[in-house]
Amino acid sequence: MSKIKPSKGAPYARILGVGGYRPTRVVPNEVILEKIDSSDEWIRSRSGIETRHWAGPEETVAAMSVEASGKALADAGIDASRIGAVVVSTVSHFSQTPAIATEIADRLGTDKAAAFDISAGCAGFGYGLTLAKGMVVEGSAEYVLVIGVERLSDLTDLEDRATAFLFGDGAGAVVVGPSQEPAIGPTVWGSEGDKAETIKQTVSWDRFRIGDVSELPLDSEGNVKFPAITQEGQAVFRWAVFEMAKVAQQALDAAGISPDDLDVFIPHQANVRIIDSMVKTLKLPEHVTVARDIRTTGNTSAASIPLAMERLLATGDARSGDTALVIGFGAGLVYAATVVTLP
């Protein structure tokens, strides 16, 4: 019987560079209030969001990804031709096939890199990071580009008081490559499909295609609404506050890291109240820098963690070599948490 030759990858993997792209247009809460009965004070108190970025016609999922990836490659000092795989996490690329990752890989100038999309909602970056780590250690790619990108403004119902203010657009990317020491810890991830209805698309694409007005939601003028993201806010809040803090602690335990050892906490930027509650539950020391990028970026789903990471490093609130806990959670419901060394 023939034996398969063992793969030869790196001993460990690490994040080597990070980049972000935020669309030019900044949208304050006042714009959101044009179509919902609310107030700037209420939006800020409930979510922490003051502004968000919305993409223009030329700021496509691919275009934003290329911009963020170029910055990540420059930060890592790696030429695109050395990228062996491109992993894109998104829920807002509307073409079912081909994967947008293939276009991004080509536009960046990779040398026929493997390229594919994944859909894991707001946990997508963590899923992509886990896949990238596995590829580097297994040996199927020396360097992997992981991208979280969203145009959630395309999936926002501006007449839905519960969600109209939440979502923003943008792209974040990291380069994952070989390391001689552990720099991406074990991933604690999973799903709770029994809660799938708590965050979902209002109408499936097949129902929207049929166009039976009697079964489709209508706007205030009687027009059929484009499918949008909806959520049961209180149910999601309770799940995130009580269950995701447990997952975050499990990730710390798996990495052999205590809260006192942490330098930075980068949770998915879903809601500032969720973030603050997790900090309290985890009993994080005051010296731990906590990402609150949501204030000016909004909830960008799969892009939120790399965007927040990029901003912390750019502003000096976090430093290269810092130990950071990252956790994403969202539609599915799904989650992924790990401890990383910042690039």
Curated annotation (Swiss-Prot):
Keywords: Acyltransferase, Cytoplasm, Fatty acid biosynthesis, Fatty acid metabolism, Lipid biosynthesis, Lipid metabolism, Multifunctional enzyme, Transferase. SUPFAM superfamilies: Thiolase-like (SSF53901). Residues 269-273 are annotated as: ACP-binding. GO terms for cellular component: cytoplasm. It is an enzyme of class 2 (transferase). Its EC number is 2.3.1.180. Its main location: cytoplasm. InterPro entries: ACP_syn_III_C (IPR013747), ACP_syn_III_N (IPR013751), FabH (IPR004655), Thiolase-like (IPR016039). Pathway: Lipid metabolism; fatty acid biosynthesis. The active site is at C122, H268, N299. It catalyses: malonyl-[ACP] + acetyl-CoA + H(+) = 3-oxobutanoyl-[ACP] + CO2 + CoA. It is found in: Cytoplasm. GO terms for molecular function: 3-oxoacyl-[acyl-carrier-protein] synthase activity; beta-ketoacyl-acyl-carrier-protein synthase III activity. It comes from the Bacteria. The keyword Lipid biosynthesis applies. GO terms for biological process: fatty acid biosynthetic process. Essential enzyme that catalyzes the condensation reaction of fatty acid synthesis by the addition to an acyl acceptor of two carbons from malonyl-ACP. Catalyzes the first condensation reaction which initiates fatty acid synthesis and may therefore play a role in governing the total rate of fatty acid production. Possesses both acetoacetyl-ACP synthase and acetyl transacylase activities. Its substrate specificity determines the biosynthesis of branched-chain of fatty acids. Belongs to the thiolase-like superfamily. FabH family. The last Arg residue of the ACP-binding site is essential for the weak association between ACP/AcpP and FabH. Homodimer. NCBIfam families: fabH (TIGR00747), PRK09352.1 (NF006829). This is Beta-ketoacyl-[acyl-carrier-protein] synthase III 1. It comes from Streptomyces coelicolor (strain ATCC BAA-471 / A3(2) / M145). The gene is fabH1.
